[in-house]
């Protein structure tokens, strides 16, 4: 795992691994701030586990303070696709997977290239997906299609974050970026229900600072945004299943209708102005 992390840093932030004084000082500071040692330990530890064991261990260790509502909305058998917002990154997938495991122990989730690079050995629970079209290749797409065909033929539930990237911090809270139409296309092809899911949680101040100041630091800091969630509250709410036939036949409109259902699950409250803004925006489409 240490070699993978060093290679990732060299690729994403090459100036950090230079041998000049400033780079060395900053790198040593970031190693402590971003818990590199713990990342390496956890990565090495789970390599000897099965996919389910690994992600349940990560969930118990790092998303242990998670509450969930609506597990009864998950079908007891057959394929379905849980469609969620993406506020934190890896922590969203780990928290949702480990909670879903209580009622479905055969789930899988869509994982981006960073997640696959670090934890790519767990092929039985991950479907690799490249959200950045510039990085997409024919071979990568072929692997994804083959993996999905296997998972859905086995009647397994999936977890997807259609934004493909982490939510953006704004003055009105966390906003998901534009959603891909993938859930709608998959539901039409495979004829399974879509399950709206809202995840509430947030990343560290350093991550949001880096997001607005330095893309390279942001990429490096993502390594820490699972391991700093221990004892921090994460809330998950699962809505009722949605048939794709209940949505618009226009895929662009259908994905916005589905997003509205996810945003409707946001917690209500006096200061939840972001919920009001979201629903006002997407209500015009539904």
Regions found by a protein language model. Name each.
Residues 5, 142-286:
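Non-catalytic C-terminal accessory region of glycerolipid acyltransferases
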Residues 72, 114-116, 133, 201-203, ...:
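Residue-level detector of flexible, active-site-proximal loop/helix-junction positions
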Residues 57, 95-102, 150, 185, ...:
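Residue-level signal for well-ordered alpha-helical scaffold segments within enzymatic catalytic domains
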Residues 1-80, 93-95, 104, 272-286:
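Membrane-anchoring hydrophobic helices of lipid-metabolizing enzymes
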Residues 65-71, 111-115, 144-150:
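Short, charged beta->alpha transition segments
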Residues 36, 80-137:
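Catalytic core of membrane glycerolipid acyltransferases/transacylases, capturing the structured
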Residues 56-60, 118, 226-229:
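Short, conserved catalytic or adaptor-binding loops enriched in Gly and charged residues
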Residues 57-63, 134-139, 172-173:
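Short, flexible loop segments at the rims of nucleotide/cofactor-binding pockets, characterized by
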């Amino acid at each position: 795992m240490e070699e993978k992390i060093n290679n990732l840093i060299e690729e994403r932030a090459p100036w950090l691994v230079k041998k000049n004084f400033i780079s060395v000082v900053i790198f040593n500071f970031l190693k402590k701030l971003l818990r590199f040692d713990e990342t390496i330990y956890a990565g090495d530890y789970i390599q000897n586990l099965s996919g389910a064991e690994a992600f349940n261990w990560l969930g118990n260790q790092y998303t242990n303070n998670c509450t969930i509502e609506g597990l009864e909305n998950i079908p007891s058998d057959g394929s379905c696709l849980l469609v969620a917002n993406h506020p934190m990154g890896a922590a969203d997938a780990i928290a949702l997977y480990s909670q879903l495991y209580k009622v479905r122990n055969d789930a899988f989730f869509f994982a981006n290239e960073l997640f696959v690079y670090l934890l790519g050995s767990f092929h039985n629970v991950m479907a690799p997906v490249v959200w950045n079209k510039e990085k997409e290749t024919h071979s990568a797409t072929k692997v994804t299609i083959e993996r999905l065909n296997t998972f859905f033929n086995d009647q397994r539930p999936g977890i997807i974050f259609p934004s493909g990237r982490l939510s953006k911090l704004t003055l009105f809270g966390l906003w998901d970026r534009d959603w891909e139409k993938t859930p709608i296309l998959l539901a039409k092809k495979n004829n399974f229900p879509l399950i709206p899911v809202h995840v509430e949680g947030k990343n560290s101040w350093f991550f949001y600072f880096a997001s607005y100041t330095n893309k390279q630091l942001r990429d490096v800091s993502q390594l820490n945004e699972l391991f700093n969630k221990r004892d921090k509250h994460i809330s998950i709410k699962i809505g009722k299943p949605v048939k794709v036939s209940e949505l618009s036949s226009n895929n662009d409109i259908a994905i916005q209708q589905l997003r509205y259902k996810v945003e409707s699950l946001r917690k209500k409250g006096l200061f939840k102005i972001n919920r009001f803004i979201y629903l006002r925006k997407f209500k015009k489409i539904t």
